[in-house]
Amino acid sequence: LLSHDKGNTMRVILHALDELGYEVDYRVIDAQNWLPQHRERIFISGFRRDIPTNFTMEDVEVPVGRKHVLSDILHPEDGSEIAEPPFTVGQIAKVADKYTLTPKLWDYLQRYAAKHKAAGNGFGFGLRGPSDVARTLSARYYKDGSEILIEQGDGIPRRLTPRECARLMGFDRVGSNRPWLIPVSDTQAYRQFGNAVAAPVATAVASAMAPWLTNTVAIRSRKCRRV
């Protein structure tokens, strides 16, 4: 967004918010500080000018120290997780075979990546293991899953399941007693999670803004009581 149309798109957005009477700030935040996914997104905050605040997006606390890796969100496939058909099946809750790429698709992705590499282009599938960080999950993931493929030893890799996508976006976690409800098809789930905002990042932004809103409500409440 920052570079779209040579920055004009962002300028139009900021100008529109300014005209509406908002004091605006923005910041690019990478979700990999919370989740095992490299996902840079612009977060824009806005307070009406009649609300007294010194808030800036730099007030958003970004956790440091722990590196999040894919094993945090992958199905363990060791029996420690209850099977959840159609995502996982059997006594050890193994990922269902349908998430493994077909030999034809895997062959195509390898040839396509090799062709682009030879031409000096940047296309390549994102093959990842349990100790890695994923590429950005996008709404096109349902097509071939190429941006995040999970290694399966020497075999053909697989896509993430929708449940793993929910975890990758911070809506769910391994071992949750109340897993995020996924009432739609895999295709729709991939689209929706790929279009979503990483939940813990949104929570961090909202948590940083909330005290200013609470303070404003308290001030106005006191003024009303005096009247």
Model-derived segments and their meaning:
Residues 1-136, 140-142:
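Class I S-adenosyl-L-methionine
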